[in-house]
A protein has these predicted regions:
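Residues at helix C-cap/C′ positions in short coil/turn segments immediately following an alpha-helix
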Residues: 172, 265-266
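Short alpha-helix
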Residues: 250-265
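Conserved N-terminal segment of class I S-adenosyl-L-methionine
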Residues: 3-195, 205-209, 222-224, 238-239, ...
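Short "lid" loop at the C-terminus of a central beta-strand within the Rossmann-like core
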Residues: 226-231
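C-terminal alpha-helical "lid/dimerization" subdomain adjacent to the S-adenosyl-L-methionine
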Residues: 243-251
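A short His-aromatic
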Residues: 196, 200
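A generic structural motif
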Residues: 153, 267-268
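Helix-to-beta-strand junctions that scaffold the AdoMet/dcAdoMet cofactor pocket
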Residues: 201-202, 215-217
Length: 288
C-alpha cells in the first residue's frame, strides 16, 4: 500500500489558510466599523460652499453638492472628539491594524517603499523654496518632516493628539505642536505641507485661508487629498470604502470643488497635475 504523499494534503491546507484569512479580514472589518460606532456626531445639510446636497445612492452617509460636486459627509463626528479619534492607540495602532495598514512605527517605511516619500520630496524640490521654515499639519509618522530637516529646513509639525506628539518628539526628535489646525499658534512659513488631511477638515475654507495667513509672500503649499476626476464607478474603484469613510472623511473633492475652494482665497493654483497614487492627488498653491 502506497503512503499518502505530502502534495495530497496541500490543497486542503491552502483552503484552510484562505478561510482563516477571510475570517480574520471579517473580524478586523467588524472591529473597524464598531470602533467608533457610538461616537457623537453632528448633522450637516450643506456643502462647505453653501450648496444644497443631492442624495448619493452609493453611500447613505454622503450627499453630493449640486454646486461644486463635493461629496459631503452628512453625519461627521462631533469636532470636540477629534483628538480622541486620532490618538496613538485608537487610530495609529488599532484602526490602522483593523484596516490592514501598518502602525505608526512601520508607516514611515511604507512611505519609503511605495514611493510616496520620494514623490513628496520631488514636489518640494520642484515647487518649494530651497530653504526656510516648513510647517507640516498632520505630520505623523514624521518621515517627511525628518527628511526636510536633514536637508536644512527649519521644520515644525502639528498633530491633534498629545500621545502622537510625544511619540514623534521621542522617536524622531521633531519639533511638533499639539492642536487642530487652524486653531493653533504657529510661526510664519515659506512652505506648508499637509498630506491626507484636507478631507478630514470640518471647515476647509477656514483651513485654506489659514494656510494663506501662515505663508510668507511667495510661499508655497503642497497638499494631498483624494480628488474624484476619473471615469471610474464607484469613485476610486477598489478604494471606494477606504475613501468614503464617514468616521474620518468629511469632504471628498472634485477638481471643480478644488478650483472653487482655492478661488475663495488669495492663493493661486500652481499645479493639479501630480499624484502619488489613485486617491493621492496633489495640489500646489502659492501666495503672491
Amino acid at each position: 500500500m502506497k503512503r499518502p504523499r505530502l502534495e495530497h494534503f496541500k490543497h486542503p491546507l491552502r483552503s484552510a489558510h484562505s478561510l482563516l484569512n477571510i475570517l480574520l479580514i471579517s473580524i478586523n472589518r467588524y472591529k473597524l466599523i464598531s470602533q467608533f460606532k457610538n461616537i457623537p456626531r453632528i448633522i450637516r445639510s450643506k456643502c462647505w460652499c453653501g450648496g444644497n446636497l443631492a442624495e448619493y445612492d452609493m453611500h447613505k452617509s454622503y450627499g453630493v453638492c449640486i454646486e461644486c460636486g463635493t461629496y459631503v459627509n452628512k453625519c461627521p463626528p462631533d469636532p470636540s472628539k477629534l483628538t480622541d479619534i486620532y490618538g496613538l492607540d485608537k487610530y495609529w495602532h488599532d484602526r490602522q491594524r483593523f484596516g490592514g495598514h501598518p502602525s505608526i512605527d512601520k508607516r514611515g517605511e511604507l512611505y519609503r517603499v511605495d514611493g510616496r516619500l520620494d514623490k513628496w520630496v520631488e514636489m518640494v524640490l520642484k515647487y518649494g523654496p530651497e530653504k526656510g521654515v516648513v510647517i507640516e499639519v498632520g505630520c505623523a509618522p514624521g518621515v517627511m518632516l525628518k527628511e526636510l530637516e536633514l536637508k536644512g529646513y527649519d521644520c515644525v509639525g502639528v498633530e491633534s493628539n498629545m500621545d502622537v506628539v510625544h511619540w514623534l518628539r521621542q522617536n524622531l526628535q521633531l519639533n511638533v505642536h499639539q492642536g487642530i489646525f487652524p486653531e493653533i499658534s504657529l510661526p510664519k512659513a515659506n512652505l506648508f505641507l499637509s498630506f491626507d488631511v484636507l478631507e478630514h477638515s470640518m471647515e476647509p475654507l477656514s483651513f485654506i485661508n489659514a494656510i494663506s495667513e501662515h505663508l510668507e509672500p511667495g510661499g508655497v503649499a503642497i497638499l494631498q487629498t483624494a480628488i474624484d476626476r476619473y471615469a471610474v464607478k464607484p469613485p476610486f474603484g477598489k478604494q471606494f470604502e477606504k475613501i468614503f469613510d464617514d468616521v474620518e472623511h468629511t469632504y471628498i473633492y472634485t477638481d471643480k470643488a478644488i478650483h472653487r475652494l482655492i478661488g475663495n482665497t488669495d492663493l493661486r493654483i500652481i499645479s493639479l497635475d501630480h499624484r502619488t497614487s489613485l486617491a493621492g492627488e496633489l495640489i500646489v498653491i502659492g501666495k503672491p
